[in-house]
Amino acid sequence: MIKTSLKLILHIFLPVTLCIILTGSVVPAFAQTAPENLSEKVDTYINETMRRLPIPGLAVGIVKGDRVLHLQGYGIANANGDPVTPQTAFMLASLTKTFTALAVYQLAGSGKIDLEYRVQTYIPEFQLADEQAATLITVRDLLDHTSGISTIEGTQPYLQSTNTTFEEALNALAQYRIKHSPGTQFEYSNWNYVLLGEVITRASGEPYEVFMQKNIFDPLEMSRTTFADHHTIPGAATGNLIVFGVSVPYNEPYIPVTVSAGHLTSTAEDMTHYLTAFFDHGQYHEQSLLHSEGPGWYDTSWYWHAGTPDDISYGFSGGHNSINTNIQLFPLHRVGVVILMNTRLDTLIPGPSTDEIAFNIARIAIDYPYELPSNRRFYSGYALLDGFLLLMVVRAIWQAARLRNWGEYYRSETRLRRILTWFGIVFDLLVFLVVLVLPLAWSTRWHVVLHFRPDFAIPLLTIGLCLGALGLIKCTELTMNTNKHGQNIL
């Protein structure tokens, strides 16, 4: 996400778009008919994209106003070889948050939630290490990701466990000290929407899942949308992890404690129902999702600008280790796109994501120029990474094999070779140090990298630790031999 433009989006572009959507007005200059051969163009784009990149399967839905223009599945859904169809169930990952936000706005419209009230109004036991800070966080702070709870805290192991209860997670959060004052800075965190799920339960008097079914999924006729464990859904899409540039089946876990932040399952067909509500006054087939006197549904901070000043678009993506989903909205054209994909290409090497794919499909739908995703950066990036890891493995094995009687070999070498040997030792120790701090480059920790990219993290961490250990052993042996023989270290 482009954080620098977030405030501009929220305070200028988004309110303007909200007015357009809620009043139902459309700029007359924009054509209201789909381009000719839309399905053929989308099919060509998707098939070529899948040919270029290791994408096992995906589903696409395109709407214009209240009409579905294109709805199609491509490729394979799972290890059983089931084809992807518009009715294939996919984990939505963080797209779940958009539904949770809608539920909060519904309750705000009915007076059961006040966005400016403190979270402790609804969850009295909510605490942080800084008790004063905990009293300042509002429901709006959770919606807008301005609570001060960090991205890293939202990926802690206790939120990745299939057995953690909400009470256990809340007790763990009580030990956390927030990074910045509530309401002052945007930082995306799953914790915000975990808490909102509980706020919905407390304010509505119903379990979160029951409220969502009655007030969102049923009115939208989203009959295949569920919070049930995706493993229990026949024919559901299963994830595929990119391992060294190759797609490998991966069994994505179902984590009940984070259900309101990322564990809704839906289909492309159901999601087109959801998209049409964005362009029809918040209604679907005469069913109103929002109270007319309540706050708008669209003024939440997780929508981001992905267009140009004269052609605004908003989108939101979701992703687990092996799943990637996205919705794109072009309000001035009343065009919406949903992409559900059973792999994720951008977790390690910068590669095409569903953001890019959905954005280009939307441009096809409004008859704008578009680009096919490039695979050059993806495959060249993995080639470099795989080559580097292979070289480091060879170096570690070679150094370990020479470790026996290494001190004697060192003393028999020329001065130049000794200097080169020291350069090698320093290099090994630097690799070790870089590996230790590398996750900080992504503002994360090693346990998160190990969870999301074990194919990369395990060999890199192993290599780093081995080279560091070898370097320390050599330094120790050289020091001991120097003292023993009274010889200059070089």
Roles of regions detected by a PLM:
Residues V26-Q32:
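Sec-dependent signal peptide cleavage junction
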Residues I2-L14:
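Bacterial N-terminal signal peptides that target proteins for export
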Residues D43, V60, D66, T88-V119, ...:
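Active-site SXXK
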Residues T33-L58, I62-K64, E252-N483:
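Catalytic loop of the DD-peptidase/beta-lactamase superfamily, centered on the K-T-G motif
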Residues I12, V16-T23, M480-L490:
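Short, low-complexity, charge-dense intrinsically disordered segments
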Residues A34-F90, L128-A129, A174:
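Short, conserved catalytic-motif segment at the N-terminal edge
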Residues N78, E131-N326:
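Short, surface-exposed loop or secondary-structure junction motifs
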Residues L115-D130, L220:
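Short, glycine/proline-biased beta-turn/loop segments that scaffold the active-site neighborhood
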